[in-house]
Amino acid sequence: MPAPLTLDGFRADLAEFLYQQPDEVDLEENPLYAGLDSLRIVTLIERWRETGADVSFIELAECTSFDQWWQLLSARQGGAGHVTA
């Protein structure tokens, strides 16, 4: 089973796509204003799903800050928010 996503890992993932150092990532920044396009967001979603965080593109697109992304991702660790039919 993959290790769960941590805040440090989340920051490192964002930093990679924003060409920053993890400690330079402003969690209050709007992801779209920060320079993340839809392809990068989808790539991040795939990476985070591998850690057990079950989120969709639409859910992240509705968030207005990286902090809101983190709140959603941390709540969904291990598929906690996944509903099965």
Swiss-Prot record:
Which branch of life, at top level? Bacteria
- Modification O-(pantetheine 4'-phosphoryl)serine, positions: 38
Q: Which cofactor does it need?
A: pantetheine 4'-phosphate
Residue ranges constituting the Carrier domain according to the UniProt record: 1-77
Q: Which UniProt keywords apply?
A: Fatty acid metabolism, Lipid metabolism, Phosphopantetheine, Phosphoprotein
Which segments cross the bilayer? none
Which Pfam family would be a valid example here? PP-binding
Record keyword Phosphoprotein present: yes
Which InterPro entries does this chain map to? ACP-like_sf (IPR036736), PP-bd_ACP (IPR009081)
Kindly tell me the pathway this chain contributes to: Lipid metabolism; fatty acid metabolism
Q: Tell me the function of this protein.
A: Acyl-carrier protein (ACP) involved in the biosynthesis of a unique class of isonitrile lipopeptides (INLPs). Is the dedicated ACP for the loading of activated acyl groups catalyzed by ScoC.
Family membership, please give it: Belongs to the acyl carrier protein (ACP) family.
The protein in question is named: Acyl carrier protein ScoB
Q: Which organism is it from?
A: Streptomyces coeruleorubidus
Name the lineage. Bacteria, Bacillati, Actinomycetota, Actinomycetes, Kitasatosporales
What is the gene called?
scoB
